[in-house]
A protein has these predicted regions:
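The feature marks non-catalytic terminal segments
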Residues: 49, 87-91, 95, 122-171
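Short, Lys/Arg-enriched, disordered terminal segments
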Residues: 1-2, 171
Length: 171
């Protein structure tokens, strides 16, 4: 089965999705990003991280601008084309792993990605710790933050002691 992890920003897939991806190797994964391109330094670093694990990446290329989340409105682009781009990518996959409806912690880009794919028949969402239907841990040594120097500080801030995530799976 084909699975898509569709997230807003390059670091989101490691912060929120790596546990699920690691525990579901039977799925043929692709990582999709709302923001950045594979030629941006952050995009290139994350694409290389997933390439080393045999996972392809797709970047939709929308600009990631801090003012969007601060002002709770899109300042550089309209939401409709972004939602359409997310859906156009997602509709070709059997399983979608993505942000929850609240945008995990209220981030406007995360909320947009969720809205765009919520109608898919098999959506797994990130959940607050221990509030999902399943909680998974990434075994130590699966990755190191040395692989992701541009993203390490933010990833470390979410996973201080161990890399553990909760998810809500369709019932």
């Amino acid at each position: 089965m084909k699975a898509l992890c569709l997230v807003a920003h390059p670091d989101d897939c490691v912060i929120f999705a790596l546990s699920y991806i690691h525990h579901h190797p039977e799925l043929s994964w692709t990582i999709g990003y709302l923001t950045y391109t594979d030629s941006d330094p952050r995009g290139a670093e994350m694409a290389a991280f997933w390439q080393r694990r045999g996972i392809n990446t797709v970047f939709l290329g929308f600009e990631d601008h801090w003012q969007d989340d601060e002002q709770k409105q899109f300042t550089r682009w309209r939401s409709e084309p972004a939602e359409a781009a997310c859906w156009n990518l997602a509709q070709h996959y059997d399983v979608i792993l993505t942000h929850d409806a609240d945008g995990d912690y209220g981030h406007i880009h995360h909320q947009l990605v969720h809205r765009a794919v919520a109608r898919h028949y098999h959506v797994v969402t990130f959940a607050p710790h221990n509030q999902g239907t399943v909680t998974l841990t990434v075994p130590p040594g699966t990755y190191t933050l040395d692989e992701l120097p541009m993203h390490g500080d933010i990833i470390r801030s979410f996973h201080i002691d161990q890399h553990r995530n909760s998810y809500k799976e369709p019932q």
